[in-house]
Amino acid sequence: MTSFAVVARLITRAPRVRASVPTRLVHGTTSTRKDSVCDKATEAQQKVAKKADEGAQTISDAAGNLKDKAKNTAEEAWDKVKDTTEKIKDTVTGKTEETKESIKATAKTVERSMNTKNLK
């Protein structure tokens, strides 16, 4: 791309702001007319600056909202992980107790069986 094409492309992608300011002053005007044009130009510049500030504030608010949503989502996910881990622990502990009781019962049965055989 030529440098002109690059500049043309950048210009077409730039945000556009329209303000009604005459492109040239008319000769022989009074100072009040000049002041009026200058006031209009200043007013247009202030409007553009105000719009830019409003846009920046909107973007800042949106970023803050996204940050809060991400934080809440992470906290909810962490709470779910903790709950699931607790359920797994309770299940494993319960099964361990059942297995322990089953082993004790089997050991007593084997012991009785051995005692019965030894008596005969």
UniProtKB/Swiss-Prot annotation:
It comes from the Eukaryota. The keyword Signal applies. Keywords: Signal. Residues 1-19 form the signal peptide. GO terms for cellular component: cytosol. Residues 48-71, 90-120 are annotated as: Disordered. Residues 90-103 have a biased composition (Basic and acidic residues). This is Uncharacterized protein At4g13230. It comes from Arabidopsis thaliana (Mouse-ear cress). The lineage of its organism: Eukaryota, Viridiplantae, Streptophyta, Embryophyta, Tracheophyta.
